[in-house]
Amino acid sequence: MKPERNSLSEKIRNAEKIVIKVGSARLSGLPSEVNDFLFQLVSDIRHLRDLGKKVILVSSGAIARGRLLLSELPSTISSGDSLAEKQALAAMGQNRLVNLYDSFFSKVNLSIAQILFGVLDLESKEGYKNLKNTFTQLVEWGILPVVNENDSVATEEVKFGDNDMLSALVSLIVEADLLIILTGVDGFLKEEKVVPFLEKISKEDLGLAGGPSGPGTGGMFTKLKSAGLLSEAGIPTAILNGKKMHVIREFLEKNSIGTLVAPSGNRVFSEEDVKEIIRKNRNGNGGNSL
């Protein structure tokens, strides 16, 4: 008998450790739009914490915030898309990004910690263990980790590819119970209709999924690839419209919005398994294969 979405409602409600991924588009619109989004996000995460849940936030947006900062400078400086320019923008914008989050989370008495890392950090002998230990300690202290790839030093050859894959890797490292990806659409669409439930990710699904439509590097394709990876590990993934009010809270309470990708296995991913995924998926080595 095939599983149905409703059969996972209890698993979703009882998820103890939740990774939430926010894309660049949610943080690069008009100031009023960004503020409205952050008010909703912070309120929902505060609600999760009050329920006793552990939350890790994976956030893009450093380069987008860097471009905004550059545009505000009283000069004629402009930026393109060269590697050096994107690295410099990330260096400028990451500080702004974390300060923005801190200003909102402090209003609900949540302390945050910035975690920046890259492919080479995880491939080093002690890097994986140190990162896992850092996550564990922060969560035990009740601190909210805010995670991003260290784009100021990452090159195209040694990048995770996008933060959808980064959020999946973080989910494996921290042994999460649920990944929530916030995007700008209502979920995975077929013929302009939301697909509410995917038992598994097929090649047809990937063929219908599009690339980035905003300032980010991912798209629905990378979201489905990441969800497919976590499905093997028994971790469900929800793809939700981050523009909707209290979308995280509504999903957990009702399990009736967005696209839910079901867990299909219970594979335990070892440190070496995660490192192999990184080697296969980083930009300079095979692109999108899993």
UniProtKB/Swiss-Prot annotation:
Pathway assigned in UniProt: Amino-acid biosynthesis; L-proline biosynthesis; L-glutamate 5-semialdehyde from L-glutamate: step 1/2
Enzyme class per UniProt: transferase
Record's protein name: Glutamate 5-kinase
Binding site for substrate: S60, D151, N163
GO molecular function term, any single one: glutamate 5-kinase activity
Recorded GO CC terms: cytosol
EC code(s) of this entry: 2.7.2.11
Keywords from the UniProt entry: Amino-acid biosynthesis, ATP-binding, Cytoplasm, Kinase, Nucleotide-binding, Proline biosynthesis, Transferase
Reactions listed under catalytic activity: L-glutamate + ATP = L-glutamyl 5-phosphate + ADP
Subcellular location per the Swiss-Prot or TrEMBL entry: Cytoplasm
A biological-process GO annotation: L-proline biosynthetic process
